[in-house]
Each structure stands twice: as C-alpha cells, then as structure tokens.
From Swiss-Prot:
Pfam families in alphabetical order: H2O2_YaaD
One term under GO cellular component: cytosol
Family, per entry: Belongs to the UPF0246 family.
NCBIfam families given in the database record: PRK02101.1-1, PRK02101.1-3
Name the UniProt record assigns to this protein: UPF0246 protein YaaA
Amino acid sequence: MLILISPAKTLDYQSPLATTRYTQPELLDHSQQLIHQVRQLSAPQIARLMGISDKLADLNATRFHDWQPHFTPDNARQAILAFKGDVYTGLQAETFSDADFDFAQQHLRMLSGLYGLLRPLDLMQPYRLEMGIRLENPRGKDLYQFWGDIITDKLNETLASQGDRVVINLASEEYFKSVKPKKLNAELIKPVFLDEKNGKFKVISFYAKKARGLMSRFIIENRLTKPEQLTAFNSEGYFFDEETSTQDELVFKRYEQ
C-alpha cells in the first residue's frame, strides 16, 4: 500500500531531528524550473498570488531567492520532520523508530506544489507554494498543468517497483487533483473521517486533517499492507462504520467528546 498525504504550510526547521538519515528528492529538475518562475515575482506579487501578508510574502521571496538545488543537512531537512500542520500533529513522525522510518520511506508519499512528490526522508528546503495557486508557467496556467502526468508516472513507477496495486488517499482535494486517477495503476481507497456535532456526523476540517495523520501513523506503526486491515483503525476514539462505507471509501466516525 502506498499512502498519499498533503504537505503543510507550517514548517519546523528548529526542533531536534529524530533521524540523521536522508535521501534526495527525485523531481528536483522540475522544482528548479518552478523556482526560476517564482524568482521573477516581486514580494507584492507573491502576496497577491498566494493571498498572504506582506511579511509572509517577504519571507517567501527570500526563500525562493536562497533556494539552491544542492541539498545538505545544513541547508535542508527531511520532509516528514519539516512539515508541521494538523496532519503532522496526528502523524508525530518525531517519535518514529528507525524501523518506522524504513516502512514510511517505502509506503508514504507527500504531494507538494514545489517538489511534486516527496518521500519522508527526502531533504527539502523551506518554501510555500500551494498546489492550487494559479502560477503561470511554461507548461500552462497553474501547477496542475505544470506537473501534468509527472506525479502520476512517479507513483506508478513506485507501485511497480514494490509490486503494489493499492493507494490510500489521505491527501486533501487540492493536492490529490495533481494525481490522475484514470492513469494510476492502482486501486484507490479514500478514508473519510466524520465527527459528531450537535447529533450529526460531518467532516470537521481540523479533526479530519489530524485523523489523516493518525491513520498514516496507524498504518506505519502496525506495518499494514492490505486495505482490509484499515478497518481496525481506532485512534483517539474513531471507529469504522461499515454501514456507510463502500469498497473505495472507508468511513470512520467519532462521537462528540
């Protein structure tokens, strides 16, 4: 099974590292082309494009300017330890054992606007470039057109090398749109997390994001390799709801706390 998750806007380049092992991203040639593109933007243009404050725009203009393709532990950090959003709060990779990192490196992939597809131990330099932004580039009007089939092809290559045919989609809609399901040589399974609010079960963004991380951790810690094993997921009060689930959409619910 190959797990797909989204990246995070919040980054951490300060905390102690849980591992010193690292690999290099596999799509850096494409990242370099995007960097060349965004370096042509002024900080005010970045602010408008990304809908962020002037301060954040200045920071990211500096990041784009400082970015260089020779990644070392001195100027970069492993992706799984650099991202720090709600998904990564659930994942808690900073507590992984060496064996957990091994399994994650094989079975977990992070989608990224700048890097395309990252393995957990791939080094990355700090950036902000969300997949959904409309960044004009030589390949089209946005990042979906820029990446085209590249991410899907890389996923197919990974699946083939592992003799695998199952992808667990724990990514957001914005990021999963960079994958072409019809061209993916795999069965796609999407876990959905519903929380009870005022007697009704619905997707609550913060909880759902964290649950995607919890599910990723559950798969990694328990070395799960078959989709039917996912139904045992019970972290932080979630339970599998067979009645509302389908073969390709597994529904997990949690009662109001």
